[in-house]
Amino acid sequence: MEKEVIAYLDNETIIDSQSVKNTNLKEIYFDNSKESLEVIRHSCAHLMAQAIKSLYPEAKFFVGPVIEDGFYYDFRVESKIGEEDLVKIEKKMKELAEAKIEISKYEITKSEALAKFQNDDLKQEVLLRIPDRAVSIYKQGEFEDLCRGPHVPNTKFLRFFKLTRVAGAYLGGDEKREMLTRIYGTAFADKESLKEYLTIIEEAKKRDHRKLGTELKLFTFDDEIGGGLPIWLSNGARLRSKLEHMLYKIHRLRGYEPVRGPELLKADAWKISGHYANYKENMYFTQIDEQEYGIKPMNCVGHIKIYQSDVRSYRDLPLKFFEYGVVHRHEKSGVLHGLFRVREFTQDDAHIFCMPSQIKEQVLEILAFVDNLMKLFDFSYEMEISTKPEKAIGDDEIWEIATKALKEALDEQGLKYGIDEGGGAFYGPKIDIKITDALKRKWQCGTIQVDFNLPSRFKLEYTDSDNEKKQPVMLHRAILGSFERFIGILTEHCAGEFPFFIAPTAVGIVPIGEAHIAYAKEIQKELLELNIDSEVYEKNESLSKKIRIAEKQKLPMILVLGDDEVAKRSVALRDRRAKEQKNLSLDEFIKLVKEKMSEVHF
C-alpha cells in the first residue's frame, strides 16, 4: 500500500500538509521516521486533550509538547485523575480516531487570541509566553487549541497509541504555583512498533534503578534530609568505591594529576567566571563574616586556581587535573528523579590546560578512555559535535582550529558522529557522548568541552617557546558525567546483575551448618585481601532459604560449604553469570576470581 503524506520538511522545519503551497518540499510519510513521529505524537497529544475535554467538560489545558519517546499534556480538572482513568480516556481517543475527524489550522492575532480565551487563565498563561505575532490554532471537531503544530490532516492517522502514566506538574515548572495534572503517552505509525515499545517499557519498570536500589540496598532518600540528596547504603557505597578506585588508577596511568578544590568559594570568584550572572538561580549561597559565598555547582574554578598557583611554561603543557568533585545544583523538586536528577552529585571531572595545537592529541586520549570504559560495561555509544553559535567569544581562527581538532580526532578513531551546527556553547565547541543501554535507550553522559572563555576571564597564561605570554585552551572533560547518574544507568542496563569486578558483594558464602562457619569466614578474609567483598550467610536458617536470599541480592557467585568442602578445602560454586555449577578446590576458586578481577584492562 502506498504511504500517505502527512507533512512536509522545509530545511529543518516540519510543515503541515494543509499549509504547504510549495510542492517541491521534502515529503514526510506516515511511518516511524523521526519527523513523522513528531507529527503523529504532537497530533496525538491534541487527540488526548479532545478526549479529556469530552469526558471532563470543565478541563482547561496548558501545554502539550512532544518529548523524546512520546508526548504529554498539562491540564486542570476538578476531578482527581488516576492511573485507572487512563483506560477510559484511551477508549474515547479511539472513538475520535475512528471518527476520521479532519484537522484544520487557522491564524489570528495575539490580541484576538487573548480575547477568544479571556475566560481561560491557562491559555492566558500560554499567550503571555508567545511573541506579538500571528497565533495558530488547530481545530478538530468541537475541540481547538493554541499550537504551533505541525499536525496530521485527519485523526484517522492516530490509531496506535498508549497512555503510559499520570503525574503532577507545577504550572510552568514553578513549584510555587499550582499543581496541574500531567498525562504521558506515546504513539507510533504501526501496531508492531507500539507493542515493541510497550514491552521495553514493562522491562524498564522491572529494571527501574529506584526499585532495584531499594531491593539491593544500594541507596535511599529521606524527607528529613531533603529531596535530591541520596544516602548511600553500604552496598551502594561499596559499588561506588570500587568504581572510584578503578577510575583513579586509570587516570593516573593516563597522566592525570589528582587535585581537590574547596566546595565553598567567595561569590567574587563566581562573578569572574560568569556563573553569578548566568547560573545563579541554580546555585546555593550563604553568608560568612558578612561576605557572600557560593557552593560550587562545577569544579572548573577550583582547577583554574590550581593552574594559577604556579608559573606555567609551554613545557608544562598539557596539564591534566582530575577530581571526584562534589557539586550542588538547585533543581526544582518536580524534576528530581532517583539518581538521574539530584541536587548533590559527584563528577568524574577533569580539566586539561593545553596549547591549541595540542587539542587533537588530548581529545584522542579522552576518546580512547571513553571507548575502553564503555566496552568494559558493554555500552555502545555515539558522539555529537556542537559547533560555533551565532553569539560566541574567541576569534574565528581559534574556533576553526578547535572544531577541526575534534572532527579529526573522531575521524582518526573511526567513530561516527553527528553535527549540531551552531549548537555549541558561546565559549567553545564540544563533543557529547551518548551511551545506549540494554533497552536501546540513549543517555547523555560524558562531555568534552573546549573553553576559550574561562582562560580569558581569569587571565590564564603560559610562556611559549619565544618567551611570550600566551593564553592556554581549557578542556572540560567528564566521562561518566556523575557517579550518581552513571550508577543509576548501569543498574538499569544490567538489571542489578553487576559485573563481578564491581559488584558490591561479589560472592555469597553459604555454610550449611554451624560447623562450617569458620571455613566460610576464612574464605571471606582471603577474598577481602583481594579486594573482593563477600557475605557469609550464617543465620540459623534452612540451606534453601540462605541460597534464595543470596540469589535475590543478584550476587555473581554463591559458594555452598558442607562437611565435604571443609574436609577437602573445596567449594561448591554456583556461578550465576555463567549459569553453571561446579566443585572446585579453594586454590582453583581463588585463581578463578583473580582472573575475573584481571579482566579490567585499560
Curated annotation (Swiss-Prot):
Keyword Zinc on entry: yes
Annotated catalysed reactions: tRNA(Thr) + L-threonine + ATP = L-threonyl-tRNA(Thr) + AMP + diphosphate + H(+)
Localization per record: Cytoplasm
Source organism, top-level taxon: Bacteria
GO annotation terms (biological process): threonyl-tRNA aminoacylation
Gene Ontology MF terms in the entry: ATP binding; metal ion binding; threonine-tRNA ligase activity; tRNA binding
Gene Ontology cellular-component terms listed: cytosol
Sites where the protein binds Zn(2+): 300, 351, 476
Residue numbers spanned by region Catalytic: 208-499
Keywords, alphabetical: Aminoacyl-tRNA synthetase, ATP-binding, Cytoplasm, Ligase, Metal-binding, Nucleotide-binding, Protein biosynthesis, RNA-binding, tRNA-binding, Zinc
SMART domains in the record: tRNA_SAD
Cofactor: Zn(2+)
Pfam families: HGTP_anticodon (PF03129), tRNA-synt_2b (PF00587), tRNA_SAD (PF07973)
EC number(s) per entry: 6.1.1.3
The record's free-text note on cofactor binding: Binds 1 zinc ion per subunit.
Subunit composition and interactions: Homodimer.
Similarity field: Belongs to the class-II aminoacyl-tRNA synthetase family.
Role, per record: Catalyzes the attachment of threonine to tRNA(Thr) in a two-step reaction: L-threonine is first activated by ATP to form Thr-AMP and then transferred to the acceptor end of tRNA(Thr). Also edits incorrectly charged L-seryl-tRNA(Thr).
HAMAP family: Thr_tRNA_synth
Cited PANTHER family: THREONINE--TRNA LIGASE, CHLOROPLASTIC_MITOCHONDRIAL 2 (PTHR11451:SF44), THREONINE-TRNA LIGASE (PTHR11451)
Protein name: Threonine--tRNA ligase
Species annotation: Campylobacter jejuni subsp. jejuni serotype O:2 (strain ATCC 700819 / NCTC 11168)
